[in-house]
Amino acid sequence: QVVAAVLLNCADATYVDEDGNWANVYGNRDVGIMAAKYDEFFHMYTDAQGIFREAPYFLAGVNSQSFLNFGVDPAGLEARVADTVYYQEIDGKEAMRVIYNPNIIHPWSHFSARATAAVIDFFTEALDAPNPIASSNQVWQWKEAFNFVGLVGFAIFVCAFGTMMLYTPTFESLRAAEVVQPAKVKDGKGKRWFWLSLIAGALFAMLIYRWILKTGTAMKVDQTEAMGLGLWSTLCGVFTILSMVIFYYCYGKKNGMDLAELGVKISLKKLGLSALLAAIVVVVSYGCIFVADYFFYADFRIWTLALKAFEAPILKYLPYGFLFVAYYVSNSVATNCFNYNNIGGKFNGIIVAVMAALPALVLPWIQYITYYSTGAMKWAGSAMHILWLFPIVLILFASTIMN
């Protein structure tokens, strides 16, 4: 047989045959399952009482027990446990079965020292490694650490290159004549407007997220993730614009707020130059990723957030990017013009950035605190949508700070 050993990473095995009977479809191959204890997508079943059980109960279920008993009906058999290798002779060959059950979530299995150790242990045992190395002897974390350094360096380059371009003759008209000082909020009403607008924006983003993601991902498009997140981004951008308009006419204008002085109101020429500068910064900055990929076969990433080189066919998906314009432009205006004030002192930017990222923090907190404490997800039907927020936390926070 071509395949000697199989380790299913956060995926279910085949437990029954075509007729629905318990079966050992793997024969005398060595087979294991990496079953994250809090997996959001696999290892679920309905128990004898008709109760739907999620991944934390996997080891107590009939599927796992049949698997560990080499495909027989587990009824009446002694319960088998995780992280223990079981052997049985099949067709003259000793085969093994094992389930690893680390206390992690699905995406963490691809970024976990425990999961990596289990993979090494499995194949060391299954393939009878002649000179085994301890499974704890892992160095991939260093690679990830330096990938993250590259990610930080990319962000620094974007800011530095964009700033440098403002000192060129073509774009110097976009640069402020002097260092812009934060606006002084002189009364309690102004402070209330500041905090309430930030809170309202965060609440709006949280409340519509699951609904708009379900709507967007149900559309018949090639990129459902981009569509769902893009629609969410657009609606949040529109809400931010409306918030700024309401603030301006209800408070700002009455208290001497000058849109031209703040840079909100600009000429068409400056608007065109701003768009051109943005395009140049994007092309040059992302060009660095292609250079790193070509010469060093490296990219910049940390866990679920990555900047990668891509091939030409991917360019057809570029129009999805326009769905994100409303949010990031309005966020830039809000951060630099409407919320840049003396509230919070030197931490003003951090406050605004935290509030921008708050929806992407709170929703996963609710999901996983519920999951870990009850054994059932808060929003099982939105499990993937909640996971998509993991990189967005860093994106929203960093983009606001970079603004």
What are the language-model segments listed below?
Residues 113-116, 155, 396:
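A generic "functional-site adjacency" signal
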Residues 152-199:
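Juxtamembrane interface at the cytosolic side of transmembrane helices
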Residues 137-151:
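Juxtamembrane/start-of-transmembrane alpha-helix segments at the extracytoplasmic/lumenal side
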Residues 126-133, 152-155, 159, 168, ...:
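Short secondary-structure junctions and interdomain/linker hinges
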Residues 107, 111, 149, 153, ...:
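Conserved aromatic-histidine-acidic binding/catalytic patches
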Residues 192-403:
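Alpha-helical transmembrane segments of integral membrane proteins
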Residues 1-139:
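Soluble extramembrane regions of membrane proteins in the secretory/endomembrane system
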